[in-house]
Amino acid sequence: TKKVYEIAPSTTINGAKAYSNMGGSQWATSNVYAKVMGVVKTSNAVFPDKHGAGRCAKLTTLLEHVKAAGIVNMDVLVSGTIFLGKMLEPVSNTKNPYSKMEMGIPYTKTPKFLQFDYRLVAPAGAPIYSNGFGSKKTLSGRDNAEVFVILQHRWEDSKGNIHAERVGTGRERFGKTTMGWVNKHRIPIWYGDIRKHAGYKPYMGLISKEK
């Protein structure tokens, strides 16, 4: 038996069942329930934890061992993530991961910043790449935690094509272990073309189609 957590009201769902938002929060997690060729597997890298008098989400990075007799036997590196939106479960294959989630919620105002409390324990050593196919690889550099807000204007044209225009951007990377909790940290949200903004960094720009 394996526990899989969601940001949701305090309750328990028993059995291999896909989770659907039960209210109380619009946040979803990368924890996932998969059913591939009749085999049920789960992945959990986001856990509940304590913060002050309340609770918080603990995002971890770990190696999940996936094994099913005669079908698959592999290690997959999983990074815990939370996002506004929902997962589309059960996941039935590993193709095009972003098609398995519906990221984003409608917005009608112009927020100035995202505020949150955080604590970071940065891993020592070089990052590892493992997608379950082939051997694990050690990469150069360091891995970072990242928080981003991307506000978009989306529309569908007369031919059914979906378009998205970047409207607002808030993005920051975190790579150093903190001395305890950092409370009320703010990531500003900038609007329009931010490339000439004093605080602009290359990773904040538009994402190329290749990535």
Model regions and ranges:
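Aromatic (Trp/Tyr/Phe) and Gly/Pro-enriched flexible surface segments
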Residues: 1-115, 130-132, 140-211
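Short amphipathic, basic-aromatic surface patches that mediate peripheral association
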Residues: 118-138
